[in-house]
């Protein structure tokens, strides 16, 4: 029996090779996984043309995945530098990479990225419209927007972000809102400008059925973008954000009916006390669709440290329903991240994802922590390094500060609690001098 998408296969009770691979990685029964995909609770972004893909699942009961953003811009147009980031991100086990290139002819980079990457690849076709078409935004037609979407799908992109919750009606309300940061979504702002200048409805909304046909043809997962995500904590959970989410829930249902896999994108900047509510609202009104969040950042006053503000919010979000975290780097709000910024962002986001998985009792999550604890008690430094999310920094710290006693560190020396207790339990003398 043939199928068009992973969702179509799941509805037809077919187990695909991608489902088998994801079930193996997640250590769950493949039939349980298929049922979750059939219900729309899990997606496996897997474009038919992404031949190097090692499939991952995103959604209920699975490990929280992380995404790394990169891409070329007008000020930093260097494909080789971005490919170096790609290689490092994959070495650091990032499950997804989004190509957010927004200047010039980006297809060469996209093709190289997809040809190389075993990680799932996402993109925002809206960013590519001006460069690909060589036209000013206001002059781009609905048909041309579709051309760009199809080009990305044909090239092998596994999931695309499209902003179909932003409508003319909401755009009018935005003119009078007391929001501080208005729209911080780049794609959302471009659509807002196009709609206002042309006095027309969002072209991605009016041509949504055509987009669904493209996605079904190539098995592209839709990541329904939140053009009105809060860009500061003051704007969190306001009427515009919730109205857009309601619109996205309806668009998600239409995608599901056409056998197109779908996940929902979320905030953003959210105070700690509102994060759990945001997760529950999305899961409730969007039929438990996988939730993909940017952060969320829990305060606005830490430029240079937003990988930390994001990790705090990301851990809470992951523990209360988020399935997919978009990384944030120390360079957020300041510049295009360099390689070191990217590494710090990945590590911080992986910590948040793992902390959330422990709280969600994802199989295997706490077990790794228990192994680390046993290694610490045994003062087994090599095992500790092996189990660490990042092994480079602990190895560096250990090497730079060698203790006199090998079975301790320079913090406590002979007064190491683990060392003392082990000696007592083993019947050995405890000599501190």
Curated annotation (Swiss-Prot):
Enzyme's top EC category: lyase
Residues that hold Zn(2+) according to the record: 269, 333
GO biological processes: thiamine biosynthetic process; thiamine diphosphate biosynthetic process
Family under the similarity heading: Belongs to the ThiC family.
Naturally occurring in which organism (per UniProt): Finegoldia magna (strain ATCC 29328 / DSM 20472 / WAL 2508) (Peptostreptococcus magnus)
UniProt keyword annotation of Membrane present: no
Pfam families reported in the protein's UniProt record: ThiC_Rad_SAM
Stated role: Catalyzes the synthesis of the hydroxymethylpyrimidine phosphate (HMP-P) moiety of thiamine from aminoimidazole ribotide (AIR) in a radical S-adenosyl-L-methionine (SAM)-dependent reaction.
EC number from the UniProt entry: 4.1.99.17
The protein's name: Phosphomethylpyrimidine synthase
């Amino acid at each position: 029996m043939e199928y068009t998408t992973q969702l179509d296969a799941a509805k037809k009770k077919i187990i695909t090779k991608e489902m088998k691979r994801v079930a193996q990685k997640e250590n769950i029964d493949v039939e349980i996984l298929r049922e979750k995909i059939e219900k729309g609770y899990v997606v496996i972004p897997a474009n038919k043309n992404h031949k190097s893909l090692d499939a991952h699942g995103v959604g209920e009961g699975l490990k929280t995945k992380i995404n790394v953003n990169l891409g070329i811009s007008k000020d930093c147009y260097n494909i080789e530098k971005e490919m170096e980031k790609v290689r490092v991100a994959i070495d650091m086990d990032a499950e997804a990479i989004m190509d957010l290139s927004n200047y010039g002819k980006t297809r060469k980079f996209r093709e190289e990225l997809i040809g190389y990457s075993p990680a799932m690849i996402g993109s925002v076709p809206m960013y590519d419209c001006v460069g690909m078409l060589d036209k000013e935004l206001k002059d781009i037609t609905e048909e041309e927007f579709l051309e760009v979407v199809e080009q990305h799908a044909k090239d092998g992109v596994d999931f695309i972000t499209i902003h179909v919750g932003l409508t003319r009606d909401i755009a009018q309300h935005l003119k009078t809102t007391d929001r501080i940061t208005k729209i911080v979504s780049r794609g959302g702002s471009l659509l807002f400008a196009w709609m206002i200048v042309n006095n027309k409805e969002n072209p991605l909304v009016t041509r949504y059925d055509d987009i669904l046909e493209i996605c079904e043809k190539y098995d592209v997962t839709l990541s329904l973008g939140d053009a009105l995500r809060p860009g500061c904590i003051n704007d969190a959970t306001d009427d515009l954000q919730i109205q857009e989410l309601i619109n996205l829930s309806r668009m998600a249902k239409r995608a599901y009916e056409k056998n197109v896999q779908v996940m929902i994108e979320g905030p953003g900047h959210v105070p700690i006390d509102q994060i759990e509510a945001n997760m529950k609202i999305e899961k409730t009104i969007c039929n438990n669709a996988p939730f993909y969040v940017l952060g969320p950042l829990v305060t606005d006053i830490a430029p240079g440290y937003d990988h930390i503000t994001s990790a705090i919010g990301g851990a809470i979000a992951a523990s209360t329903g988020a399935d997919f975290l978009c990384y944030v780097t120390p360079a957020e709000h300041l510049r295009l991240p360099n390689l070191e910024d990217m590494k710090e962002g990945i590590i911080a986001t992986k910590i948040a994802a793992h902390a959330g998985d422990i709280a969600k009792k994802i199989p295997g999550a706490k077990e790794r922590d228990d192994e680390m604890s046993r290694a610490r008690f045994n003062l087994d430094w090599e095992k500790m390094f092996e189990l660490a999310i990042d092994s480079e920094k602990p190895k560096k710290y250990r090497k730079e500060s060698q203790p006199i006693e090998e079975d301790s560190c320079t913090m406590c020396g002979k007064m190491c609690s683990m060392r003392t207790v082990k000696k007592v339990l083993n019947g050995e003398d405890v000599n501190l001098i």
